[in-house]
C-alpha cells in the first residue's frame, strides 16, 4: 500500500487504512485443498462388496478404473478383458452391450473410464521389446473397442521400467495413464516403479500409491512411519514429490472401507487432512513437510464397490474436501 503523506488527509484516511490493514488477514487465509482427482476401481467381479453397474458410479469419481484386464495366455505381454459372468448374473443379466453403453454414459457426465491391468493376482510380464509391443497393441485394441480413455498399471509382482515405459509410449488413444504401486515400490527413485513413473512423466496422469497392506515405511525425513496414520501418507508422498514427480502426479490410495484391505484403513477425513497438509501446510499431523506443493494430484480408493457398501463415505468425504 502507498501511504498519503499530506497531514490534512491522515485523519480522513484512518478508517480506510484500518480496513485495509485488516483485510489481508482474511484474504491470505490458507485454502482447503480438495482432491484434484478422485480415482476409484470398479470391480469386474464379485467378492462381498456391492455389485454395481458401471453407470451406478457417482460423478464424484473423476476417473473410474475397470478392474481388471488379465494376461493373454497365448501372447506374451498381451492382455485381454471380458465382463465377468458372475458379476453379470449378480446384476440380473448385465451384458457386454450394457457395459459399453455405460462407458458412454460416464463420458457424457465428464468422467474418464480406464482399463486397469493386473491387480494382486495379475501375472502380466513385459520384459522385452516383443512383449512391450504386444502389450501396447492389445491395450490399444481394448481402448478402441470399448472406448476406454486410457490405462492403469497395477502390477504387484515386479515390473520392468524400461520395457513397460516403451509399451506405454506405444499405446494409441490413451489420454489417461495411471500407476498404482505399493508403498515399497516408491521408497526410492532406484526402484522399478519409481523409475517407470519418471520414464513416462511426459504422459503420466497420476501415481496412486497404495498406502495400505504395507506395514511401516520410511518417510522423506528418514523416520519410520506406520500405516493407518496421516503422517504415513504425507511423509511417504513427500518422497515422491522430492523425487521428481509433479505435484499433480502424486495421489494417495486408500481402502474405501475397513473391508477393502487387510490393513491400512483410516478415516477418509485423514486423507483430506493429508492433502491439505501437502498442498497448504495446514492440518498436518506430527510430520510437517519441508515445503508445500499446490495442485497435489488427489486420491484413489479400493474400491468404488466397497465405498458403495459403506454409503460412499470415502467419496463424499474426500471429494467434498
Residue locations for each model-derived region?
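Chitinase-like catalytic core of GlcNAc-active glycosidases
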Residues: 30-251, 256-273, 290-296, 306-320
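Short glycine-rich, acidic/polar surface loops and turns
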Residues: 283-289
Amino acid at each position: 500500500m502507498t501511504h498519503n503523506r499530506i497531514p490534512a488527509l491522515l485523519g480522513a484516511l484512518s478508517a480506510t487504512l484500518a480496513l485495509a490493514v485488516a483485510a489481508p488477514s482474511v484474504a491470505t487465509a490458507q485454502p482447503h485443498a480438495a482432491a484434484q482427482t478422485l480415482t476409484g476401481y470398479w470391480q469386474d467381479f464379485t467378492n462381498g462388496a456391492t455389485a454395481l453397474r458401471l453407470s451406478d458410479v457417482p460423478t464424484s469419481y473423476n476417473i473410474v478404473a475397470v478392474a481388471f484386464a488379465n494376461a493373454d495366455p497365448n501372447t506374451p505381454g498381451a492382455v485381454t478383458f471380458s465382463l465377468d459372468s458372475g458379476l453379470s448374473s449378480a446384476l440380473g443379466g448385465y451384458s457386454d452391450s450394457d457395459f459399453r453403453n455405460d462407458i458412454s454414459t460416464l463420458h457424457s457426465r465428464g468422467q474418464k473410464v480406464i482399463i486397469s491391468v493386473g491387480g494382486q493376482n495379475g501375472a502380466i510380464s513385459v520384459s522385452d521389446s516383443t512383449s512391450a509391443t504386444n502389450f501396447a497393441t492389445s491395450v490399444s485394441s481394448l481402448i478402441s473397442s470399448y472406448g476406454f480413455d486410457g490405462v492403469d498399471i497395477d502390477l504387484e509382482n515386479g515390473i520392468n521400467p524400461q520395457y513397460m515405459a516403451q509399451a506405454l509410449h506405444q499405446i494409441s488413444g490413451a489420454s489417461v495413464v495411471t500407476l498404482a504401486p505399493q508403498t515399497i515400490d516408491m521408497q526410492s527413485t532406484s526402484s522399478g516403479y519409481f523409475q517407470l513413473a519418471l520414464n513416462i512423466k511426459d504422459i503420466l496422469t497420476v501415481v496412486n500409491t497404495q498406502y495400505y497392506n504395507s506395514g511401516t515405511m520410511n518417510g522423506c525425513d528418514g523416520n519410520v512411519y506406520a500405516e493407518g496414520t496421516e503422517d504415513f501418507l504425507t511423509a511417504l508422498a513427500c518422497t515422491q514429490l522430492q523425487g521428481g514427480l509433479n505435484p499433480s502426479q502424486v495421489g494417495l490410495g486408500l481402502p474405501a472401507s475397513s473391508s477393502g484391505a487387510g490393513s491400512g484403513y483410516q478415516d477418509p477425513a485423514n486423507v483430506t487432512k493429508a492433502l491439505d497438509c501437502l498442498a497448504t501446510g495446514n492440518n498436518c499431523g506430527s510430520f510437517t513437510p519441508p515445503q508445500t506443493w499446490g495442485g497435489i494430484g488427489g486420491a484413489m480408493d479400493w474400491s468404488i464397490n466397497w465405498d458403495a457398501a459403506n454409503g460412499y463415505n470415502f467419496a463424499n468425504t474426500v471429494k467434498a474436501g
